[in-house]
């Protein structure tokens, strides 16, 4: 009996979003369209920035990095989720689950760092424009992006290593559509208090630090914008920052709800809805938010279309 109680789990069953076959078919089509749009738009933005010399600036370099991360972190979840919507019993091996968690964690943490770097870029451009070329040189941009990736990797490795040290016994049904930490911790037969503390400490500190960086940057930007005499100048400054601030608010709002809360306040169904939004919704919305009112991007797209028609 004791041996049966402590059978080692080699795979997890992902319960997903629903058991209804008809709804699964509808969700498959909807999520496939969203994922395809996300990939095409983000990869298209990267290509557009590469081929348009006018967009070879720190701001658009960072935007291309953000687009790459968005494409990656949606790809860490969406393909497996789409496959699971087509099968009766969705399973994932323990090793694949850890890899999925690692990839998703790296990408989403890196995104948080990148958003704070983009806020710093806007801060320097508006508050100290004379120092902009020095503060945001090509080398500095590469260093900031590299640091963002390193931060994402280190943070996620800590959680993944601590997660692998846990024992998973008989229970292996994950009440989620991917290997999310809170859902996995609920299945462990080990003491998970240290994992919860690490999650709250590291992810919480990183989220708060990067979010405060954004907020402080925009406070200085707001004061600097008010000192701009021309109305058009103020409007341009606010317009440039509004899109990024919107993306930041959506991103951190969903993450704080999902991760920075005690397990006693963890509601599975609400978490699934929020997770669906930040795994598929945010990567698609980010690009729309950043490019919707961006004249440079619109002009670059128009020129690219005209060039295509000319070549044809």
From Swiss-Prot:
Query: What is the membrane topology listed in the Swiss-Prot or TrEMBL record?
Result: Multi-pass membrane protein
PROSITE patterns reported for this sequence = G_PROTEIN_RECEP_F1_1 (PS00237), G_PROTEIN_RECEP_F1_2 (PS50262)
Q: State any GO CC term.
A: plasma membrane
Q: What protein name does the entry list?
A: Olfactory receptor 5J2
Q: Which family does it belong to?
A: Belongs to the G-protein coupled receptor 1 family.
Broad class of the protein's primary localization: membrane
Gene3D superfamilies given in the database record: Rhodopsin 7-helix transmembrane proteins
Tell me which species this is from. Answer: Homo sapiens (Human)
For this protein, the parts annotated as crossing the membrane are 26-46, 55-75, 100-120, 140-160, 197-217, 238-258, 272-292
**Glycans attached where?**
5
Q: Which SUPFAM superfamilies match?
A: Family A G protein-coupled receptor-like
Residues on Extracellular side:
1-25, 76-99, 161-196, 259-271
Disulfide bond entries: 97-189
The UniProt keywords, alphabetically, are: Cell membrane, Disulfide bond, G-protein coupled receptor, Glycoprotein, Membrane, Olfaction, Receptor, Sensory transduction, Transducer, Transmembrane, Transmembrane helix
Localization: Cell membrane
